Amino acid sequence: MNAADESLGNVLLVGLGAVAIQVALDLRRHGAGRLGALNHPGRRSQRIAEALARGACLQLEGQGQHRWLSGNAALDVFHQDPAELRDDWQTLVLCVPADSYLDVVRGLPWERLGGVRTLLLVSAFIGANLLVRSALPAGCQATVLSLSSYYAATKVIDETQPLRALTKAVKRRVYLGSSRPDCPARETWRRVLAGSGVEVVPLATPEAAEGRNVTTYVHSPFFLGEFALARILSEQGPPGFMYKLYPEGPITPGAIGAMRRLWCELSELLRRMGAEPLNLLRFLNDDNYPVHETMLPRASIDGFAEAGAERQEYLLFVRYAALLVDPFSPADEQGRHFDFSAVPFRRVSRDEDGLWRLPRVPLEDYRKLALIVALAAHFDLAMPQARSLLASYENAVSRFIDCQGASQCHPSLYPIDSRPAADAIYRQWCSTC
């Protein structure tokens, strides 16, 4: 472990799931001060507390070419109750689902967190930075940083061992925006993530970084549609695969068309908020998963934004067809490459109280898109494609609730009113213009 980085100070991880375990390892390698974690009370938190009491530490296993990321990290303190926090922390890292940012920030005892200089949002959506700033108490001078998305693919290996996680992939590049463009924390986090081989590109505004959250563009058209929801909300039959072509998965010409139209709607929202939109195909290829130039020539990628709608949809379809297998994996003896797209949908399941719950995909994607649509209304944008996807989700979930019975379903299945949060984002945006 390196010497403590004074610009980070003591770091509190808010939320202690798979993402926090990866972040903790990166912070320990870089050199933070004290490292603590806060997790909301519940059965999982109790298991964490019991494991820590037995002397367990955070354990990360890197898979395949990322095996070198493996390691352990000890926590200096763990809290289940925000009321236990003291003014010991200079950096807060929000490792919670993005749709819970507002509730989490409002639930922190800011009267005892006067030393906090920086908040990092690990996977921000469009407007998240403004939303968090709107919830900070008057006089709070903390800088809020937005990462475009979480920079790895990490999961807890076994829920009975909540301190162990597996990282199977790491992004090549993520984007970072700050509420204060000249703040030194941007360079600090660039160095922290470089330790895992991730390039951090600073952008002029938080909204510019948030507009590069890949799940906003991909999950919504693929996983809020009829095919995906039929598999997610069913206990019977094959689960289907998230990134395969129909009939094995949700990818059809229609879904690709929805992706293109959603990108156009999001691009206009970003423009009105003063942020530069992205070239969707270049973003998907260069920053996420590339394909061979035989399938997508460089000129087609770079000229995507200027192409016509039909050409754009063709190029997007070619990309996802090219990623049915990992194009850069070695072929086996039969000449077959790794079945990259065979990621099964997670289905609804009953929680420990016997209530039906949706998996994070598509629940978080629905909530994020609902908030973006409510925000867009302040900029006189109708976003018909986004609204169509929201309606698809709401209708499918409503039918599921009717079938199972309302008493059997967790309240999180019901639609939410995103307008108050959107109003707060818009007021904060107006105050900074």
UniProtKB/Swiss-Prot annotation:
The keyword ATP-binding does not apply. Keywords: Cell membrane, Membrane, NAD, NADP, Oxidoreductase, Transmembrane, Transmembrane helix. It is a single-pass membrane protein. The keyword GTP-binding does not apply. Its main location: membrane. SUPFAM superfamilies: NAD(P)-binding Rossmann-fold domains. The active site is at 219 (proton donor/acceptor). Its EC number is 1.5.1.-. GO terms for molecular function: oxidoreductase activity. It is found in: Cell membrane. Induction: Is part of the operon cntOLMI that is negatively regulated by zinc level through the Zur repressor, which leads to transcriptional activation of this operon under zinc depletion. Highly induced in response to airway mucus secretions (AMS) treatment. The chain crosses the membrane at residues 7-27. Catalyzes the NAD(P)H-dependent reductive condensation of alpha-ketoglutarate to the intermediate formed by the adjacently encoded enzyme PA4836, namely (2S)-2-amino-4-{[(1S)-1-carboxy-2-(1H-imidazol-4-yl)ethyl]amino}butanoate, leading to the production of pseudopaline. This is the last step in the biosynthesis of the metallophore pseudopaline, which is involved in the acquisition of nickel and zinc, and thus enables bacterial growth inside the host, where metal access is limited. Therefore, this enzyme probably contributes to Pseudomonas virulence. This is Pseudopaline synthase. It comes from Pseudomonas aeruginosa (strain ATCC 15692 / DSM 22644 / CIP 104116 / JCM 14847 / LMG 12228 / 1C / PRS 101 / PAO1). The gene is cntM.
